[in-house]
């Protein structure tokens, strides 16, 4: 009988001018981006945490602390690959990724397929195993006021 594990990931980053908006490894044209030690890819960070959590391997901060200058400006897909590889080393395979980006703007619907494809390629999955959804916060709280962006992800692993 196979062993099924589920991991939940969440991340938030402040909106900042002079930064790129990178979501799921895709640069989205925008007059602002997300602030962070790495490239601040809020989606990649949430999925990374979900993989690590499902495999009981800690969290992204444990593996890539923001106090370490090696990760300054780092492409967050590096983090995602690392989590994938660690889970694989423990005998797990990623079965499914479901994620949500919560952001007032820019509107992301035109980037959905590109983001899904980039994530699927990075995780070595068929694209039909990667879901990316977009929501707004309906003008409520820091996300709704356009001051931050959040992402949530749930990952299923099988051994």
From Swiss-Prot:
| Name of the protein described by the UniProt record | 2-C-methyl-D-erythritol 2,4-cyclodiphosphate synthase
Taxonomic lineage from the root: Bacteria, Pseudomonadati, Acidobacteriota, Terriglobia, Bryobacterales
* Keywords of this entry: Isoprene biosynthesis, Lyase, Metal-binding
**Could you say which cofactors this protein requires?**
a divalent metal cation
Q: Which organism is it from?
A: Solibacter usitatus (strain Ellin6076)
Binding residues for a divalent metal cation? 11, 13, 45
Q: SUPFAM superfamilies attached here?
A: IpsF-like
Q: What does this protein do?
A: Involved in the biosynthesis of isopentenyl diphosphate (IPP) and dimethylallyl diphosphate (DMAPP), two major building blocks of isoprenoid compounds. Catalyzes the conversion of 4-diphosphocytidyl-2-C-methyl-D-erythritol 2-phosphate (CDP-ME2P) to 2-C-methyl-D-erythritol 2,4-cyclodiphosphate (ME-CPP) with a corresponding release of cytidine 5-monophosphate (CMP).
Tell me yes or no: is Transcription among this UniProt entry's keywords.
Answer: no
Record-listed 4-CDP-2-C-methyl-D-erythritol 2-phosphate binding positions: 11-13, 37-38, 59-61, 64-68
Query: Quick one: which gene encodes this?
Result: ispF
Assembly: Homotrimer.
Gene Ontology molecular function terms on file: 2-C-methyl-D-erythritol 2,4-cyclodiphosphate synthase activity; metal ion binding
The note on cofactor binding and number reads: Binds 1 divalent metal cation per subunit.
User: Would you identify the family this protein belongs to, as annotated?
Assistant: Belongs to the IspF family.
